Amino acid sequence: MVKFSKVLMLMVLAGTVSAAFAAEGDPMARAVFYGALAIGAGVAIGAAAGGGAAGLGNAIRGVLEGMARNPNMGPKLLTTMFIGMALIETFVLYALLIAIIFIFTGIFDSKAGF
C-alpha cells in the first residue's frame, strides 16, 4: 500500500510539473501535458464505466431477486429498474462529455488563463 501511494504521489507530481512547463511554451512539455491529459481522460471514463457496470449489475440483481420473491411486482420493478439504469448510464455519459471537453477545448491551455 505504501508503494502504491508513493507511485501515485509521483504521478501527481509529474502531472503538475508538466503543466508548469507547458505554460512556458516548450513543445515537448506541451506534448507531455496533453498526453497526460488524454491518459487522465481515459482513466476517468474507465472508472465511470466500471462504476456504472457495477451499479447496473447490482440493480439487475436486486430486481431479479424481487421478482423471484413476488412475481406480481415484476412490471413495477422493471419500470423502476429501467429508470435507475438510465440514470446510471447518464453518469457514464457525463464523464465522457467532460473528458471530451477537457481534451478538445484546451481548457487548461495557458492562453485560456487557467
From Swiss-Prot:
What keywords are assigned to this protein? Answer: ATP synthesis, Cell inner membrane, Cell membrane, CF(0), Hydrogen ion transport, Ion transport, Lipid-binding, Membrane, Transmembrane, Transmembrane helix, Transport
According to the UniProt entry, its GO molecular function terms are: lipid binding; proton-transporting ATP synthase activity, rotational mechanism
Query: Which Pfam family, any one, appears in the UniProt record?
Result: ATP-synt_C
> Does the record bear Iron in its keywords?
no
Membrane spanning stretches: 31-51, 88-108
Q: Which PROSITE patterns match?
A: ATPASE_C (PS00605)
Task: Identify the GO cellular component terms for this protein.
Answer: plasma membrane; proton-transporting ATP synthase complex; proton-transporting two-sector ATPase complex, proton-transporting domain
**What membrane topology was assigned to this protein in its record?**
Multi-pass membrane protein
Q: Which domain of life is it from?
A: Bacteria
- Site described as Reversibly protonated during proton transport, positions? E89
Question: Per its UniProt record, what SUPFAM superfamilies does this chain match?
Answer: F1F0 ATP synthase subunit C (SSF81333)
Q: How does it assemble?
A: F-type ATPases have 2 components, F(1) - the catalytic core - and F(0) - the membrane proton channel. F(1) has five subunits: alpha(3), beta(3), gamma(1), delta(1), epsilon(1). F(0) has three main subunits: a(1), b(2) and c(10-14). The alpha and beta chains form an alternating ring which encloses part of the gamma chain. F(1) is attached to F(0) by a central stalk formed by the gamma and epsilon chains, while a peripheral stalk is formed by the delta and b chains.
| Protein's job | F(1)F(0) ATP synthase produces ATP from ADP in the presence of a proton or sodium gradient. F-type ATPases consist of two structural domains, F(1) containing the extramembraneous catalytic core and F(0) containing the membrane proton channel, linked together by a central stalk and a peripheral stalk. During catalysis, ATP synthesis in the catalytic domain of F(1) is coupled via a rotary mechanism of the central stalk subunits to proton translocation. Key component of the F(0) channel; it plays a direct role in translocation across the membrane. A homomeric c-ring of between 10-14 subunits forms the central stalk rotor element with the F(1) delta and epsilon subunits.
**Which protein, by its recorded name, is this?**
ATP synthase subunit c
